[in-house]
Regions:
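Flexible, acidic/His-enriched mid-domain "rim/lid" segments that flank
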Residues: 2, 23, 61, 96-156
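Terminal domain-start leader segments
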Residues: 1-62
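Short internal beta-strands
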Residues: 56-61, 67-72, 117-118
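Short active-site-adjacent helix-start/loop capping segments
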Residues: 41-44, 50-52, 65-68, 76-80, ...
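Short, solvent-exposed amphipathic alpha-helical segments in soluble enzyme
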Residues: 48-50, 85-86, 132-135
Length: 156
């Protein structure tokens, strides 16, 4: 994709994703669903202005699995301008079952059983999104990955 407003090259984001996958595996998780805009930006460069709408970056712990992004349909042009990610799924606000969509994409990425991390402490994850998402992900066990995902950005 052409990303005229990307802050970093794709190679930098792929390195970040690789480090994220390493931490995900170390934590014994099958993958993660990132909902916090700051984590999504850090990992794929998508600079969301719609942080108040549901979004999700689905990452498998497996290195050969490409991440997928679920966003509102009207936000797609901004993804194309700021990120290299190609697997982007869109939903229509108030018309789509977003939690089911995110869970279905997670299953497509091989996340069907075991433990999955979500940045549960994010302001971008209100109860109206969190509760149906946890239910839709069953039988997977949801774990709080807020610290795991946030720690990727620490400067040592």
């Amino acid at each position: 994709m052409d990303q005229p407003f990307a802050a970093f090259p794709e190679s930098e984001h792929r390195e970040r994703l690789s480090r994220a996958r390493e931490k995900i595996r170390e934590a014994g998780l099958a993958g993660c669903i990132c909902v916090a805009p700051e984590n999504i930006y850090y990992l794929i460069g998508y600079d969301s202005i719609a942080y108040f709408n549901y979004q999700a970056l689905i990452i498998s712990a497996e290195e050969d699995s490409e991440p997928a992004l679920v966003i509102r349909n009207v936000d797609l042009p901004l993804v194309k301008e700021t990120s290299w990610i190609e697997d982007v799924r869109t939903y229509h606000l108030h018309a789509s079952d977003i939690a089911k969509m995110v869970a279905d994409v997670a299953r497509e990425k091989g996340l069907r059983e075991g433990r999955i991390g979500i940045d549960l402490q994010s302001y971008a994850l209100p109860g109206a999104y969190a509760l149906p998402l946890v239910k839709a992900l069953e039988p997977m066990q949801v774990e709080d990955a807020t610290e795991l995902l946030g720690s990727l950005q620490y400067i040592k």
